[in-house]
């Protein structure tokens, strides 16, 4: 973005390396080398993007100064209920005091309120693709909320960077496989947000 200046790229296990070592398509010059989070001068930062495993963004959120806005891609600030978070992700939430200062951000529906919150919690891939068409339908009472069935597809990159045999290209090419049917983690945030819109309990 022309109005964004990248001051730090952080990945504690890859400190000292250049980002294009991991992604050759990144051709932008003058990007900083990867550094450790502990070496960041927060006084120079306005916005922090985090793309970390669930549970890790909470640790960062606890230490950054109040003036730094956090845009988080994990599930750490998507769910309002801490018991629901623990049920689906298996860990206790460490930043309960920050939940009220976060917003579940599908821009098409939350744009007017993004400036009000410190933490912008980005939804998962499935919830985004599902809610963008469903929310207008629910608002206009065009679907029955007690019988919503969803059949969604995504690319394998959503499974993370760790190499798994079943996610190797030769095993995926021209094929499709089901996973998380009836128990996908993203169900919790979809239920939460659609319930708000429907003003009655929604279970997908």
Regions flagged by a language model, labelled:
Residues 181-204:
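Oxyanion-binding "anion nests"
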